[in-house]
Amino acid sequence: MKNKVRVAWISAPAFICVDKFIVPEVSKYMDVTWYIIAKENEVLDFEEQLEKLIKLGKINCKILRHKERNCDFGIIIWFIKFLKNIKREKYDLIYQVMIGMPFYMPLFRFYLGCKNVLIGIHNVKIPQGGSNYWINKLYVSFCIKSFKYFQTFSNDQKEQLLKIAPNKHCTSVPFVSMDYGEIDKSVKENKDVITFLNFGIIRDYKRIDVLINAAQRAYEITGKMFKVIIAGSCNDWEKYQNKIKYQELFELIIKRIDDNDVAKIFERSDYFVLPYQDIAQSGSAIIAINYDMPIIASKLPAFEEYIKDKKTGFLINPADVEDLTKTMIYILNNHYKIYNKLVNNVNEFKLNNFTDEKVAEKYINNFNIVLKKFKEI
């Protein structure tokens, strides 16, 4: 019997929400050891699910914790020890998600090289207004220059990378459908107000102010009552709160959302709204697709991959209050005519593109392509 390809899969807690679906599928065909690098006291999302998968023998997962912050010089010793252990294992392929800014990836390159390494890179283009913009930009630039093989999570990011570095090899996979538990569909059927949702960490480039202003204009023009749920943590919420004139329109859940509460928020919502000014890709949009929810989003390449205008949602001019207002008014006037068709279209798109098996198959194909290239060197 031919031995399975041995793969080290190295990532961080932020990616568990996706990897927990993919690693078990890939592990059916490859011998995967999944390393999760976390801070000592960091609470891991889905930890119970991971423990269950380990007990069932579906994954070989090692959670490794360090005391230091990524930016502390003391963490360098911890990283070096970990990387030396990986080197001793002599894996056929190392799949490394880009993590550990600013020290980890330079140390990885020094100790492990790039020959049998595939780098998973989420944001080739760093969104304007994101945290630590220039440091992130330099870190990504270093990685692209220093490694040969990459995997992005959208075709748009793949194209961005190949524009910057046409001599590199880059594949892409979609995000897996991100499932936070079942929803009670009768909740939507029995409620009497249309509900728009924005979910996720609130950052400047996501332009929550555009949603607030557009919702209030739509209310003033139509006089129709509806609901806008804004759910997610925010470091400077007061600047958004000051824009709200009609408190009755908004349900505000401004805090970190527990995983167990995500499905409950989505089951009460009809449309997902993302009026971003810039974006590389959006995990929250994939959650909406998982729950068959039509999306209103900015006309940006990252969203155009997933949203077909007037079929699975609506595309608006980026961060444009007037355009979003028009779209919300159209929905308020036509919701009961258009909604079921939109939902069915989203569901069909999900089944054709985002099942665990389909996404895992793309990972395996990409791994095999890169393994073949290693042998050709």
Put a short name on every predicted segment.
Residues 8-11, 68-74, 82-103, 149:
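Short N-terminal targeting/anchoring amphipathic segment
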Residues 16-17, 78-79, 94-114, 280:
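An aromatic- and histidine-rich active-site surface loop
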Residues 145-183:
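Donor nucleotide-sugar binding/catalytic pocket of nucleotide-sugar-dependent glycosyltransferases
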Residues 189-206, 212-215:
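Conserved donor-binding/catalytic core segment of Leloir-type glycosyltransferases
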Residues 239-263:
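Nucleotide-activated donor-binding/catalytic signature segment of Leloir-type glycosyltransferases, i.e.
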Residues 264-280, 293:
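Acidic donor-binding loop of glycosyltransferase active sites
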Residues 309-310, 314-321, 328-336:
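Conserved acidic donor-binding segment of nucleotide-sugar-dependent glycosyltransferases
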Residues 337-353, 362-365:
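A short, well-ordered alpha-helix in the C-terminal region of glycosyltransferases
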